[in-house]
Amino acid sequence: MGQYLAALYSQIYGLCLDVSLVEFCKPTSLCLTKIADACNKVHKIHEYVSASLLQQNSLEACALSLELSHLLENLKTRLFFIYHALLDNPTYFSKLHSSVGLCDLHKKLNVQFYNECGIEVNLTLINDIERFLSRLNCVFYCLSSSSALLALKEALTFLGQLRGISPVPRTDIYITSSSCLECVLETSVVPNQGETLNELLLNHNCHHLVERVPPEPIKGLFESELQNLGLKVHIATDTIEQSVGKHEAVLQESLAYLKAHTIFNNTPKQVLELSNLLYWNSGQNQPSDSGVKCSELSKIWSRENELQKYRPKLNNGEPPGHFFDLHSPQGTELLFCGGIFSSTHDTITALKQDCSNTFMKQTRLTGVAKRQNELFMRLSNILYGEEVPTKPKQTESALKTCDQSDASKNQVLQEAELRKEAYLNKLSKEGFRKLQACLSTHEEMLNSQLSLKIWGSVVYKQSATLLNHFLFRQSWVTQASLPPSVNGSPEQFENSKFIKSSLYVKSLSREYLSTLRLHFFALITGPLTTQEGLFPSPPNVQLAHCLEAAHFMPHQKMLLNEMIKPTMEPQDWICSNFNEFYTIHETDLNGVQYECWKYLRELVLSVALYNITWEKNLCIYRTDHSCPTACSSGIKEGLYVTYESHAPLILVYSNKKWIFKDLYALLYAHMQLANNGAHR
């Protein structure tokens, strides 16, 4: 079934790409009949598939099914809108791309936690949805599955509005400077060099919500296409010819001289020295002469204008009338969106080259760089048979020169000239190195901001994971039943009191409490950061990722760390109330969360003490790791916590599931079942 879903997704995704391009095409170039035919086909597919997708997402969702449902709904609506816009060609673009009116890409969610604690969440960007999912992942145990599913449904509806049909998201619905949960997970595995996670993520660019497409070289691509169509294309590479420097000519002549030499020839001394000079100086970026008279950016725009002239020839002389012809970018806008025949990567590369050329035009630094390296001078001497001038022997250091009482004025001037030349040499090296580092940094920043981006799968994966968590919780409660002894009955009260009295006189060792702390951390770690596999992270690390992604406050981390202390006794965690496990009394979210911590702490410590006292092996499991089935033979026996206030605990034993509201009544029932094999 998954293969058919993936095949349908790929076809719908490709059709969405085509339709998103149709929105910018000249209306007279489109066939109204084909648009209507495509609209009818998509409508039939939507009718046939939507019910199955809805059922799939209500049982066990996946990122593919969630995104496919959004694409189908948006594609059906958009094609219908395009068809009606084509009926009036003059207003085609204004109907499709008009920004008149109020923006509807805003959503306000009201999330209801336990005990009627409500929180309002404002959604505007894709980042807001991801942030909401990360925070819900941190407090998943503080609300019922029905409330969570209602909030997630509204968030997914808003995500569908942002998704549209184009694989390229609008630039006003996301920001890359805000980190996501995946950024936290990736940053946590690299060396931090003593810096905190917030410091490492300070200038971080996120490429998970929207993925950056690697740039492709497109220079010469359109020229080849035009030539294949039979057009004679001649594009001047430079608006103004760039003069070839003397040094460049010598270098080319040297390479031509070496071309005639093979490994079967004897190697003369001049050839060997020439080869060595070329080899050892190949890694040095020699600054070009000031012969560059045309900027690289100007060349791009000149090429753009030249290629634009060939477009009417391909359209029988008719002027082009696509959206980008009627609303073409001008001035500085070209720097941010590029042109039809050039990409933003070409623009950024040209800007970098122009900055480098401008720097190297400075007379002093260029002159110093020329004097620094004698490569071209020596190449010329070898090629033309001249003697290589030897460098005059440098004078001794300035200190020894000054100590000599008979030092002449010429020696002092020569020493000063050598020092000046060494200083300028170092200055040019350092300046050029800093320039290249600066240009590389800004090139990466511009590529991050201006490069083409497409929709990522992170938000849909996180949505599917959280949906399944709450769907499984709901299913577990639905398929479980009440025990033979009704919850809250006098019999259960006596059973609960017996277990409590027995546990009060026992205690847990300090070493065991440290181990149980990790088990407690595992129960409050959200499903988005719960790792499974051969080498999962420890529970405390997984919880740290969960809290960092939700921007948990330091004082809250302190309270959480103090929940289980090495000196705790049973009276510190056992609640005296009967049949009120996971009953929330606080009215604010922080209070609700702290009360949930206390209940889960009581669960972990009391079950551990029960296992020691009666030599049992009752294990605690979460209900979000597996979907309950009608046949429970594949489910492990043990205690399952659902985090549902009305049915928090489920005991699975002998292929049966019983709901308990009191922890100690459940422990008594498990003891009787383990001893006698029947529930008394």
UniProtKB/Swiss-Prot annotation:
Molecular functions per Gene Ontology: ATP binding; zinc ion binding
Predominant subcellular localization, coarse grouping: host cell
GO biological process assignments: viral DNA genome packaging
Zinc finger feature spans (C3H1-type): 180-208
Keywords associated with the record: ATP-binding, Host nucleus, Late protein, Metal-binding, Nucleotide-binding, Viral genome packaging, Viral release from host cell, Zinc, Zinc-finger
GO cellular component, one term: host cell nucleus
Binding of ATP, residues: 610-617
The keyword Protein transport appears for this protein: no
UniProt-listed InterPro entries: UL28/UL56
Localization per record: Host nucleus
Family statement drawn from the similarity comment of this UniProt entry: Belongs to the herpesviridae TRM1 protein family.
Subunit relationships: Associates with TRM2 and TRM3 to form the tripartite terminase complex. Interacts with portal protein.
Function (record text): Component of the molecular motor that translocates viral genomic DNA in empty capsid during DNA packaging. Forms a tripartite terminase complex together with TRM2 and TRM3 in the host cytoplasm. Once the complex reaches the host nucleus, it interacts with the capsid portal vertex. This portal forms a ring in which genomic DNA is translocated into the capsid. TRM1 carries an endonuclease activity that plays an important role for the cleavage of concatemeric viral DNA into unit length genomes.
Protein name stated in the entry: Tripartite terminase subunit 1
Natural source organism: Alcelaphine herpesvirus 1 (strain C500)
